[in-house]
């Protein structure tokens, strides 16, 4: 997958807040290295995995999984409460889907308010934008929703997340079976990849820079 033609992977938040839709799915022939574009105009194509003759793709900015075959993309799982990232096959069938952060009402509101969003991007440093993050809680300058305030030294795990950690086990049909969380009061956020090895599941939490074993 190619998440964005307009922004580098380090500037993913610029692509989100700029309402980017230049992602692609590309097939590369292992014999001669020739590349073939299977789909374009995707809103940040992050992960891809074969599924029943199609390719299952996570489209992060549209919060969904789609199946891409010879025809038009077909929705498989929509209206996710998170920003999906990579997909990998799971032992026994199905898939592991990682999510690098969760959606919030505040960010959804900013994405709809075009004039405010453009002014924010122009006048405020990117690290202080009202936008999702791979990690949070490191600066008092971070934007917050009211319920995200620390009270008596405690941050509620169900508070609106600025960063989050999640991996979901999907069935062979791409439907959720169960999930594992690092909630708002956790630190293993920004989960961008998963891999099974032996009897363990390994996760890459990019927020704290950790490789996790479950």
Residue ranges and their predicted role:
Residues 1-214:
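Sequence-structural signature of mature extracellular/luminal beta-sheet repeat domains
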């Amino acid at each position: 997958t190619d998440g964005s033609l307009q922004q580098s992977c380090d500037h993913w938040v610029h692509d989100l807040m700029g309402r980017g839709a230049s992602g692609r799915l590309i097939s590369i022939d292992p014999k001669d290295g020739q590349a073939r574009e299977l789909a374009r105009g995707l809103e940040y194509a992050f992960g891809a995995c074969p599924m029943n003759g199609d390719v299952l793709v996570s489209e992060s900015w549209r919060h969904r999984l789609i199946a891409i075959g010879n025809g038009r993309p077909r929705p498989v799982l929509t209206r996710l409460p998170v920003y999906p990232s990579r997909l990998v096959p799971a032992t026994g069938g199905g898939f592991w889907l990682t999510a690098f952060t969760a959606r919030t009402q505040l960010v959804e509101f900013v994405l709809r308010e075009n004039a405010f969003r453009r002014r924010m991007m122009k006048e405020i440093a990117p690290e202080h934008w009202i936008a999702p993050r791979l990690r949070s809680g490191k600066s008092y300058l971070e934007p917050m929703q009211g319920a995200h305030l620390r009270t008596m030294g405690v941050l509620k795990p169900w508070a609106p997340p600025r960063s989050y950690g999640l991996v979901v086990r999907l069935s062979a049909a791409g439907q959720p079976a169960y999930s594992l969380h690092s909630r708002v009061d956790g630190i293993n956020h920004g989960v961008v990849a998963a891999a099974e090895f032996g009897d363990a599941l390994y996760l890459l939490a990019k927020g704290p820079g950790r490789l996790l074993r479950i």
